[in-house]
Amino acid sequence: AEETSFVFSKFKPLEPNLILQGDALVTVAGVLQLTNVDKNGVPEPSSLGRATYSAPINIWDSATGLVASFATSFRFTIYAPNIATIADGLAFFLAPVASAPDSGGGFLGLFDSAVSGSTYQTVAVEFDTYENTVFTDPPYTHIGFDVNSISSIKTVKWSLANGEAAKVLITYNSAVKLLVASLVYPSSKTSFILADIVDLSSVLPEWVRVGFSAATGASGGKIETHDVFSWSFASKLAGXXTKDSSFLDGG
């Protein structure tokens, strides 16, 4: 498929178009809950969950040299009972079709080593709430681009609004290899943006899965919720000379 698009305005408890891994589930209220909470809604430690779209996405084509541009938007909240002890974060990712949950905690279910490795074939936009110094994390909550490594190639400070719904738009323009992520809190009108050049065709396989991964801390009460309320995605294979990036505004 040269073009793919889908919209989840909310999620269904038995959603056929979602692959749930680890602790991820859809609540009766239609919320994609990536990590565990107890019966009182309190997040639990050492939890890891992922959710991906059921169909693989064609991100580039070796026969034609075409590379996809894409736009995805989603709404999520992170809520920590104690803002002083939070971990670890949520990520939107593109990874090989056979990708399975990896190490939890600071690895966010996407990697298993602090060392970069081309075999991961993974690109992620992380919303990271914990400073893992071994991953060269900055000393604050941040948005980061992860390319074959949990150590981000670029980060920007992100002021987490505890329990507030954030709206995220991530776009990739294949003509100029530009990856852009923005996060807005509509209630407080604060926004954060990160952009960098990433050549997806040199990192990812031709077909990928797209979705979310999240994890809580293993010890010390470093816990938070990771809830996704809605998600849309559109991609289109395009040549380098294309002018059609109209869908990149995310609708």
Curated annotation (Swiss-Prot):
D-glucose binds at residues 88, 106, 217-218. Pfam families: Lectin_legB. Mn(2+) binds at residues 126, 128, 137, 142. Keywords: Antimicrobial, Calcium, Fungicide, Lectin, Manganese, Metal-binding. GO terms for biological process: defense response to fungus; killing of cells of another organism. PROSITE patterns: LECTIN_LEGUME_ALPHA, LECTIN_LEGUME_BETA. InterPro entries: ConA-like_dom_sf, L-lectin, Lectin_LegA_CS, Lectin_legB_Mn/Ca_BS, Legume_lectin_dom, Leguminous_Lectin. GO terms for cellular component: protein-containing complex. Heterotetramer consisting of heterodimers of alpha and beta chains. Galactose-binding lectin. Exhibits hemagglutination activity in a calcium- and magnesium-dependent manner. Also binds to several carbohydrates including lactose, D-galactose and GalNAc in a calcium- and magnesium-dependent manner. Likely to have antifungal activity as it is able to inhibit the activity of the A.flavus alpha-amylase. This is Seed lectin alpha chain. It comes from Spatholobus parviflorus (Butea parviflora).
